A protein has these predicted regions:
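Acidic/histidine-rich catalytic cores of soluble enzymes
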Residues: 2-9, 32, 130-232, 238, ...
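A short, acidic, flexible beta-alpha connecting loop/helix-capping segment that sits on the rim
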Residues: 11, 259-274
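Active-site acidic/histidine proton-transfer and metal-coordination neighborhood
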Residues: 18, 59-64, 77-173, 274, ...
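Acidic (Asp/Glu)-rich catalytic clusters
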Residues: 21-26, 48-69, 93-103, 130-138, ...
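Active-site-proximal loop/turn and secondary-structure-junction residues that shape catalytic pockets
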Residues: 10-12, 36-38, 74-77, 111-115, ...
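C-terminal helical cap(s) of enzyme catalytic domains, especially alpha/beta-barrels
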Residues: 272-290
């Protein structure tokens, strides 16, 4: 059974962390992914929840009929500086413990690091994982990585190779729809290769920045080392959702009990309720049609 979760980022400034379960239930969702939030933990920082808040959050989720599936911290696993690596290990160790305490044994995250220092960043990543894999095994938590635009690895296939090199089933891959055109736009060949190591799929649309001879987006001065993508409602961009969900069906992902699809639209804060409800209906439609 596919679990469809909401990323509540659009509500960070208006809804308290403890109210997120009631929010997602009101929007029709049964599942929630916890993402960077002032009360939960900000990008690159140590988490700010204690056991008392975790207990309250679990109680609120149970009362709302909502399951917390996963947590999403962003840490500098790819360094490349030594203090970045040490902070990532220290902070993520606590996030892993929190995930276990929440009964949400999945941590989804990003590689980070710097693309212009790819070799150093990859080494930093492997060193961080050497320290964290024993923690994952001890706590019974899965860690999945998204090659985010401007990380040290952005291409989907190369990211999978890096994950595969860890030689552990405790670490998997996050396929992010809004990163399609940075990943290489190759879902139909990439996802079969990843196979059972696909840990989560995020659904938001984006435009293909390669179109119009690369002039669809213009930054000045020309040649800036920038990355452009969006997190739009499904159908508002260029992602081939029929192909993506067809591939997810063909590879067996949609038939897995632990399948997780997360709606993560960030471009519609002023229409967040309508967007969230639309996304839920559209994801169900795509699953049914696959």
């Amino acid at each position: 059974m596919v679990r469809i979760a909401l990323d509540p980022t659009p509500y960070n400034n208006t809804v308290h962390l403890l109210d997120f379960p009631d929010l997602v239930a009101r929007l029709g969702y049964e599942y929630l992914q916890l993402t960077p939030n002032p009360d939960f933990g900000r990008h690159f920082h140590y988490p700010k929840v204690d056991s008392d808040m975790i207990a309250k959050l679990k109680k609120r989720a149970k009362h709302a009929g909502v399951t917390i599936t996963s947590v999403l911290p962003v840490q500098r696993f790819g360094g490349p500086e030594e203090h970045h690596v040490q902070a990532a290990i220290f902070n993520t160790t606590r996030y892993i413990q929190i995930a276990a305490e929440l009964g949400a044994p999945v941590v989804n995250t990003e590689f980070s690091g710097r693309p212009e220092r790819e070799e150093e960043s990859e080494f930093a990543f492997y060193r961080a994982m050497e320290a964290l894999i024993p923690v994952l095994e001890r706590e019974g938590v899965q860690l999945n990585f998204d090659p985010h635009p401007d990380d040290f690895v952005e291409d989907g296939l190369e990211a999978w190779r890096i994950i595969r090199g860890l030689n552990t089933d405790q670490v998997g891959f996050v396929y992010v729809g809004s990163h399609t055109f940075h990943l290489g736009d190759r879902a139909s060949t990439l996802l079969p290769e990843i196979g059972d190591r696909l840990g989560a799929v995020y659904t938001a649309d984006t435009f293909d920045h390669h179109r119009s001879n690369g002039l669809r987006y213009i930054t000045n001065p020309p040649g800036n080392a920038v990355r452009v993508h969006q997190h739009l409602n499904i159908g508002d961009g260029d992602v081939n959702w029929t192909e993506l969900f067809g591939t997810l069906k063909r590879t067996g992902y949609l038939d897995r009990d632990d399948a997780l699809i997360v709606s993560n639209v960030f471009a519609e804060d002023e229409n967040a309720d309508e967007s969230s409800r639309f996304q839920l209906a559209k994801i169900k439609e795509l699953i049914a049609a696959a």
